[in-house]
From Swiss-Prot:
Location in or out of the cell: Cytoplasm
GO CC terms: cytosol
Name of the protein described by the UniProt record: Ribosomal RNA small subunit methyltransferase G
Keywords: Cytoplasm, Methyltransferase, rRNA processing, S-adenosyl-L-methionine, Transferase
Disulfide bonds: none
Molecular function terms, GO-annotated: rRNA (guanine-N7-)-methyltransferase activity
Family per record: Belongs to the methyltransferase superfamily. RNA methyltransferase RsmG family.
Domain of life of the source: Bacteria
Chain positions recorded as S-adenosyl-L-methionine binding sites: 89, 94, 140-141, 159
Job of this protein: Specifically methylates the N7 position of guanine in position 527 of 16S rRNA.
Length: 228
């Protein structure tokens, strides 16, 4: 299948935006990581029409609403020398591919139920040379440690997967001891938090500041009881 041509974009302009954004987020990235992130934006634009990855077509808005949005959670997830991370409902690879680029010591698994999107994720693994990235297709509630995935995860993240209570119900069996579920949300999800299932609780709520984005963003960390 042939990719349609993406909108023309000045890579230097995008690079300047990315540098400003990562500086605002206090993230020190290498030149190689900056280039990988810019390559990822270009590939999202190139293959979007084929894989139906995002409604956003403008590369600058892709950088802001996808890349910087995903980068805004990095400092809050850090604290482990290495970590096993599952990105549920990853779609075009967000935030998982961004995490794999900026945290090469983490093992990132992308999960989606749509085979076409998994195919794109696998292609990104090869094109961006992400040895720490793996892809698994299927419903998250059907994934079993030691079968579809090697083991349980320290962090399970989602950017646009489901209602928070549903996310916790479906993914909790994959949380490793001491691990957490992390949900990226827009406005503060009071109603969703009120419906959290028994044996789960909010550990912290973080208001995110995404550079160049005038919109509310929150990161919710949920702990689950190991017995559940």
């Amino acid at each position: 299948m042939t990719a349609r041509r993406a909108p023309a974009v000045n890579r230097d302009g995008l690079e300047q935006m990315l540098v400003e954004g990562t500086t605002a987020l206090d993230l020190a990235l290498t030149d190689a990581q900056h280039n990988q992130l810019l390559d990822y934006v270009a590939l999202l634009g190139k293959w979007n029409a084929v894989y139906n990855l995002t409604a956003i077509r403008d590369p600058k808005q892709m950088l802001i609403q996808h890349i910087l949005d995903s980068l805004s959670i990095v400092s809050h997830l850090r604290g482990r020398a290495s970590a096993r991370v599952l990105d549920v409902g990853s779609g075009g690879g967000l935030p998982g591919i961004v995490l794999a680029i900026v945290e090469p010591d983490w093992q990132i698994t992308l999960n989606d139920i749509v085979q076409k999107k998994s195919a794109f994720q696998t292609q990104m693994r090869a094109e961006l040379k992400l040895a720490n990235l793996s892809v698994v297709t299927g419903r998250v509630e059907s994934l079993q440690p030691g079968v579809e995935v090697p083991e349980k995860f320290d962090m399970i993240v989602s950017r646009a997967f489901a209602d928070l209570s549903d996310f916790v119900k479906l993914a909790r069996h994959l949380v490793a001891p001491g691990g957490s579920i992390w949900a990226m949300k827009g406005v503060h999800p009071d109603d969703e938090i009120a419906r959290l299932p028994e044996g789960s609780r909010v550990k912290q709520t973080i208001r995110l500041a995404v550079p160049m984005l005038d919109a509310e963003r929150h990161l919710i960390e949920v702990a689950v009881d190991e017995a559940n």
